[in-house]
Amino acid sequence: MFFDFDSVEYYSLNKNKEESVVDNNKKGIKDSIFNDIFYGDYPNELNNSVFYKKINSDDFSKFELSNKDAEYLRNYIFIDKFSLKMFEANRACAPEYRDILVFKKKNKISGIAKICLGCGQFYIISSKKEIQTEDFGTQKEYKSLKKLFESYKKD
């Protein structure tokens, strides 16, 4: 298991913020913290207050995952496993992390997973030291995550 957790918060980038970031980047106007979140391997530590302030802003929608969905993530998605991922097609694009999961144990952050459903890339940081993420992210897992995320975005 990648994270020791009892609850999961899901953050979804709002479409209007995504469009404004792309437009501003084209104009040379950059929000370096937001660009780090959206495009990069950031944060590099769990207790980064700037990261949490930014994802708790109006730029993201926040959802508390149900116990059932958190259990699904624990038992089927974020686990150490052997997969045949190496035989799947690799995608070569720059990730755009629109979907972020924050894992908590007793209200303390135990991990972060940033997911790019568009190109199949991910960034994971955990309080556990020896996690193996190489086999994470099969097409089936991304399809399951997309379905899960969409179920929370519905109004």
Question: What is the predicted role of each segment?
Answer:
Residues 1-155:
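Function-determining sites in protein domains
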